[in-house]
Amino acid sequence: MEWAPMNIRAPTRLAVGRVRFYGQHHGEVNCSAFSPDGRTLLTASDDGCVYVWGTKSGRLLWRLAGHRGPVKSCCFSPDGRLIASSSSDHSIRLWDVARSKCLHVLKGHQRSVETVSFSPDSKQLASGGWDKRAIVWEVQSGRRVHLLVGHCDSIQSSDFSPTSDSLATGSWDSTVHIWDLRASTPVVSYHNLEGHTGNISCLCYSASGLLASGSWDKTICVWKPTTNNLPLQLKGHTIWVNSLAFSPDELKLASAGYSRTVKVWDCLTGKCLETLKGMLDVAHACIFTPDGKLLVSGAAVTR
């Protein structure tokens, strides 16, 4: 993992440099996530483990082992009490942060689980994967609440809306589905956002409800999902887009491409503010710290 520090007083320029390198993984880094207070960093690796780091010290706090295949996704619950991880072993694991202990193993997918995301109130968890289905789980009990069927190919990304009443899923069928979770029935309705011409590999909501999606077509779409409006389409990546993250103030959007670069965009104008280079290998993940001062990028580095 690498850190690129940002000068937030000069929003059009970034102070770029490696702050810390995390090199204890024994496989590619597929995902990274900060705790809500910014004190802890998660990394998910092809070696089957989730790594929990102290952000200031850079020290490895825990290595969460239990998956029987590469860990494809990981995230903290918004209340900071839980960690969710998903794997190619078809399962999702819920971990207690305080005790670094696995609380639930959620089984319901038939193939690799590529994405997990918590609802803003930390009460629900969404997952999706190669079986073309998304599942919404009740966190406390591990019970399946909704089975979401409608995509024609693998689901690679998911995120709840800020109000928790809808879920966005991105698929290799080139569409984004917005699922209405207000229904009390297990099966819910959805509508499509169509604008990409390639597999959708990542998406994320902003705090105000904007939705960004990245694709193999090398573009990023920024949507207003409630109106199906597409106010911005960002072009500049030369290879497909792997990861997206809004800054906490929503003025910037970071994107990691399947190359050794991370781009930072102005969310108002669509202009590329900076192209960050210097990754050792493919940039698999990017995320802002909760205070917006640092941008973290994860690469396929195994040493």
Curated annotation (Swiss-Prot):
UniProt KW Lipid biosynthesis keyword: no
Give the record's GO biological process terms. hematopoietic progenitor cell differentiation
Map the WD repeats onto residue numbers.
Answer: 24-63, 66-105, 108-147, 150-189, 195-233, 236-277, 279-303
Report the Gene3D superfamilies cross-referenced here.
Answer: YVTN repeat-like/Quinoprotein amine dehydrogenase
Q: Entry's InterPro entries?
A: G-protein_beta_WD-40_rep, WD40/YVTN_repeat-like_dom_sf, WD40_repeat_CS, WD40_repeat_dom_sf, WD40_rpt
On whether Ribosomal protein is a keyword of this UniProt record, the answer is no
Task: Note one Pfam family from the annotation.
Answer: WD40
- Annotated keywords: Repeat, WD repeat
Q: Which domain of life is it from?
A: Eukaryota
PANTHER family with a match to the protein in the record: TRANSCRIPTION INITIATION FACTOR TFIID, TRANSCRIPTION INITIATION FACTOR TFIID SUBUNIT 5
Protein name, per record: WD repeat-containing protein 38
Which organism encodes this protein?
Mus musculus
This protein's gene is called: Wdr38
